[in-house]
Amino acid sequence: MIKGSIQEEDIAIISIYAPQYIRQTLTDIKGETDSSTIIVEDFNITITPMDRSSKQKINKKTQVLDDTVDEMDLIDICRAFHPNAEEYTFSSAHGTFSRIDHILGHKSNLSKIKKIKIVSSIFSDHNTMRLDTNCKKKTVRNTNTWRLNNTFLKQVY
């Protein structure tokens, strides 16, 4: 977990790889998360049938992941921005594709996301995901700046 701030806005980023223990892992970190948390994970599982090139029924693991994400008030940011897109993050040697890498965020924080996209990678069987935020650069007036008092400039005759 990385905690910090971007343009004076708190953010926490959690990276997870836990295909066998999805529910337990999310439950364990629930106390560490808040509305500023972004979870980046490879669960080796899709969340919706649309996330696979081969249309299969939703299995129990998929349903458990979907239920757990809902219980934590999280949202699949990529699916929220691209509800009908058939883009994939993983390609198998069998010629099938799936979106098994996810970026989850709190539902109330969705307005802070500018865009998200899947970027092709030629060096891996997983594509990269890019997330841009709406953090605006804040102009802060430096209170330590010295200023000349203009009354000293009056000429006395």
Label every PLM stretch briefly:
Residues 1-157:
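A shared catalytic/ligand-binding motif for oxyanion handling
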